[in-house]
Swiss-Prot record:
This is Fin bud initiation factor. Homodimer; disulfide-linked. Seems to also exist as monomers. It holds the Pfam family Fibin. GO terms for cellular component: endoplasmic reticulum; extracellular region; Golgi apparatus. It comes from Danio rerio.
Length: 210
């Protein structure tokens, strides 16, 4: 009974191994496929514009057909195909990285790293703030000087007005004094004239009597 079981066990094991071998997939794993091709878009120069030609921005990866796993399949051919696909993927990835590198270099504006770029931008921003603060201080000083000049002008106008009032008052006083002096002289002249008239009248009368 044991001798009969051994050949049966070997036969069952062979059948199972053949079924397992027939279900095994030795081909490469691919990304999501659409119509048998994998579409990957990139911008050759790294700068996307609306007028870029879509044909130049599209790469088509040829996908291999699913191959049945057979015991007598040429493994060297499979490996060569896998290496060809990997090589294409690497070349396409290199082009994508080149475009990304150009985009990054454009963003960095000639700097070697983002650190240097950020330090330069920070320095420029600090200088801009410093210049703005300096301009504000200068404007504040000019505003204060303008206020001081306005106060000086106001004080000068007030002083000139007061001086004019004082001068006018002095002129009026002097005019009044002169007027009073003239009045006194007029009265004196009137007295002298009346005195002379009296003397002339007396002399006339005396002369007529003679």
């Amino acid at each position: 009974m044991g001798t009969m079981a051994s050949p049966l066990f070997i036969l069952i094991a062979c059948l199972l191994s053949m079924r397992v071998g027939g279900a095994f997939f030795a081909g490469p794993l691919y990304p999501e496929m659409s119509n048998g091709t994998f579409h990957h878009y990139f911008v050759p120069d790294g700068y996307y514009e609306e007028n870029d030609d879509p044909e130049k921005c599209q790469m088509l990866f040829k996908m291999m057909d699913n191959r049945k796993c057979t015991l007598d399949e040429d493994q060297d051919s499979v490996i060569r195909d896998d290496f060809t696909i990997i090589k294409r993927h690497i070349e396409d990835a290199a082009r994508v990285l080149e475009g990304i590198g150009k985009s990054i270099s454009f963003d960095l504006d000639g700097e070697d790293s983002y650190g240097k770029y950020l330090r330069r931008e920070t320095t420029q921003i600090s200088e801009a703030f410093s210049n703005s603060e300096k301009s504000l201080l200068e404007l504040e000083v000019k505003f204060k000087q303008s206020q001081e000049n306005e106060l000086k002008e106001e004080h000068k106008i007030s002083d000139d007005f007061l001086n004019m009032i004082v001068h006018t008052r002095d002129v009026l006083k002097e005019t009044l004094d002169i007027s009073l002096g003239l009045k006194d002289k007029h009265e004196l002249l009137s007295l002298i004239i009346r005195s002379h008239g009296t003397r002339l009248s007396r002399l006339k009368n005396d002369y007529m009597k003679v």
